[in-house]
Curated annotation (Swiss-Prot):
CC terms in the record's Gene Ontology section: TAT protein transport complex
Entry keyword set: Cell membrane, Membrane, Protein transport, Translocation, Transmembrane, Transmembrane helix, Transport
Coiled coil (UniProt feature): none
HAMAP family in UniProt: TatC
Presence of keyword Ribonucleoprotein: no
Protein name (Swiss-Prot/TrEMBL): Sec-independent protein translocase protein TatC
Gene Ontology terms for molecular function: proton motive force dependent protein transmembrane transporter activity
Membrane topology listed for this record: Multi-pass membrane protein
Keyword Repeat: no
Entry similarity comment: Belongs to the TatC family.
Gene name, Swiss-Prot/TrEMBL: tatC
Length: 241
C-alpha cells in the first residue's frame, strides 16, 4: 500500500517491456511524421538553402559546391531542420504523453513554467545568431581577404556553419534559465557568482570556444559578449525572484 501511495496520481505500474513498447510506438509515430515532412519539404529545400545563405553571407560572395553530394547533403539537412520545426508540437506532445504518468503535479507545473521560457530563449538565441552574429562574422572574416582573392564558399561547409551557429547560440541562451534554476534550487548562491565574475567569464569563454570553433577568435568574442550580457541579466533577475 505504501508503495502504491507513493506513485504519482494517474500513474500505473508497468513492466519494463510495456514501457519499452510504449516508447517504441511513440518513436515510430515521431520518426514516420518526420520522414513524411522531409519528403514534403524536399522539393523546396534548394530554395530554402539559398534563402538561408542569402541573408547570412554577403552578396558579393559566390556560393559553390566542391563535391558531388555536397548540395544534396545540405538539402537533406534543410529538410530535417524544417521537419523538426514543423513537427515540433508533435514531438513535445509525444514526449509529454510518455513522461506525464510518472510526474507529480508539482513537476508538471514546473515543466509548464520552464519549458515555454526555455523555448523562447532558444528561439531568441537562434535569431540573434542568424540576424546579427552570422552576417557580422562573415563580413569581417571574408572582408580581410578581398584584396587578395575573390571569395567563393562551399555550400555544404557554409550551411553547416550557419546551422551550428544558430543551434549553438540557441543552446547558449539557456544560460539565464540555468543560472536562475540553480540559484532557486540552492545549488549555488547568487553572492558566489557575483563575487566570482572573472571565473564565470572564463567558463563562459570556454563555452564560446566549444560552440563556435573559429581560429580567428572573432566569433568566440561575439558569443562571449552575448553570454556576459545574459549572465548579468540573470543576476538582475535573481535579485527579484
Amino acid at each position: 500500500m505504501a508503495a502504491e501511495s507513493s506513485l504519482p496520481p494517474g500513474d500505473m505500474e508497468m513492466s519494463l517491456s510495456e514501457h519499452l513498447r510504449e516508447l517504441r510506438n511513440r518513436l515510430i509515430i515521431v520518426i514516420a511524421v518526420t520522414l513524411l515532412l522531409m519528403l514534403a519539404i524536399f522539393p523546396f529545400s534548394a530554395g530554402l538553402v539559398d534563402a538561408v545563405l542569402a541573408h547570412a553571407v554577403p552578396s558579393y560572395v559566390k556560393i559553390t559546391t566542391y563535391a558531388p553530394m555536397e548540395m544534396f547533403k545540405a538539402r537533406l539537412t534543410m529538410c530535417f531542420i524544417g521537419a523538426i520545426t514543423v513537427g515540433f508540437p508533435l514531438l513535445v506532445y509525444e514526449a509529454f504523453r510518455f513522461a506525464a504518468p510518472g510526474l507529480y503535479p508539482h513537476e508538471k507545473r514546473f515543466l509548464y513554467l520552464v519549458f515555454p521560457f526555455s523555448l523562447l530563449l532558444f528561439v531568441a538565441g537562434g535569431l540573434v545568431a542568424y540576424f546579427v552574429t552570422l552576417p557580422l562574422f562573415f563580413s569581417i572574416v571574408i572582408g580581410h581577404g578581398l584584396e587578395v582573392a575573390a571569395p567563393a564558399l562551399s555550400v555544404g561547409e557554409t550551411f553547416s556553419i550557419v546551422t551550428n551557429f544558430v543551434a549553438g547560440l540557441g543552446l547558449v541562451f539557456q544560460v539565464p534559465l540555468i543560472i536562475v534554476l540553480a540559484i532557486k534550487m540552492g545549488l549555488v548562491k547568487r553572492e558566489t557568482l557575483v563575487k566570482g565574475r572573472l571565473g564565470v567569464y572564463g567558463l563562459l569563454f570556454g563555452v564560446a570556444m566549444f560552440f563556435s570553433p573559429d581560429p580567428t577568435l572573432f566569433s568566440q568574442l561575439i558569443v562571449l559578449a552575448v553570454l556576459a550580457i545574459l549572465f548579468e541579466v540573470s543576476m538582475v533577475l535573481t535579485r527579484f525572484l
